[in-house]
Each structure stands twice: as C-alpha cells, then as structure tokens.
A protein has these predicted regions:
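Cysteine-centered catalytic environments shared across enzyme families
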Residues: 1-186
C-alpha cells in the first residue's frame, strides 16, 4: 500500500504545503517519500512508498528517461514482465526495477487504451509534459482508493485518502470509479 497525491493548476502554494499534505498519508508508505514539481509549479505529484517490488531502486514518482513522463502508483502490476517482453517486445530499457514503470511505456505506445492491458491492483497518476495532461485511474475491481476534488480556486487534487482534502474549500469531491480513468488538460 502506498499513498499518492497530486495537485494540478496550483495557485501560490509552497513546497512545505505539499510536503505537509503528503505527510498526512505517510502511514500508507513509510519506506520512501518523493515529490515532483513541474518547473512552473502547476503540477505537483507526491508519493509515499511501501516497497514491495523494486525495493532497492523503485522510488517514486518515477520520471521517464526522457523526462517527459512522471508516474506515481499505488499498487502492483502482476503482468508487467509479460507486458514488457511480449507486448512491448523489450523496446524499452527500464530505469528502475519497479513493476509499475511499464505503465509509462504502455502509455507511450498505446495512449489511453493501455489501461485495459494492466492486470493488477492499482491507482495511479501519470503526467505527460508534452501533451500537458494528467491521467488518473483505478483498477477494474477498485481495490485501491483514489479520490479527486476541485477546489474553489479551480485546483484539482487527486489523492489516496480523503484526509488530504481537509482545509481545502471544495466545489466537488468524487471517488474515482473502479476501471475508469480521467484525463485533465491544462
């Protein structure tokens, strides 16, 4: 179990603010915490990691070799080896030993259609710098939680737990439904 958290279209928040929000879900992943901030600070992705696969070098958020894709995942992709070898035909060299890194390469090859290829339990946040979009998704069974809210200043927050929304005046708060994905463009 990990904790994932993203802020999109942010307005005047400090790095300390994001770190404090991330600490609210630290119990979900005590082994590592990481944060990614886009250069304009419009996109912030935080990760609290519980190491299961890729214990030594599976830190998240995962940043692709080219630097254009940033990924934070709560979960496990059971068929990642099959996907790397038989679907992607070993065209990509993984930079981590994480089972979740395959998500980046599937997205590059198949766009949003890749999600139905995943066998596992997961919720994830994937940022594509080139397309200026963020994708959030949950597995078809909905084992791992993911919530999404829109604040009064039109910031979008996605998180593993509701407590990350405390203190924000929300216009909308929803559970990301199992087996679905949402794309946010900015």
């Amino acid at each position: 179990m990990c904790g994932i958290l993203a802020f999109l279209n942010n307005i005047n928040k400090s790095r300390e603010y994001y770190l404090n929000r991330s600490k609210l879900i630290r119990h979900r992943g005590p082994d590592w915490n990481g944060i990614y901030c886009s250069s304009d600070e419009e996109i912030v992705i935080c990760h609290e990691r519980l190491s299961i696969v890729g214990i030594d070098n599976g830190s998240q958020p995962i940043i692709s070799k080219c630097g254009n894709y940033i990924l934070s995942v709560n979960g496990e992709i059971y068929n990642y080896k099959n996907l790397l070898h038989n679907v992607l035909h070993d065209r990509y060299e993984c930079t981590t030993t994480s089972d979740c890194e395959v998500i980046i390469y599937l997205y590059k090859e198949f766009g949003h259609n890749f999600i139905k290829m995943l066998d596992g339990i997961f919720s994830f946040i994937l940022y594509d710098k080139n397309k200026k979009e963020v994708i959030i998704s949950r597995d078809p069974i909905g084992i791992l939680p993911l919530y999404c809210g829109i604040s009064e200043n039109n910031s979008i927050i996605a998180c593993s737990e509701l407590k990350c929304f405390d203190g924000d005046k929300l216009l909308e708060l929803d559970v990301v439904l199992p087996g679905t994905f949402t794309v946010f463009q900015y």
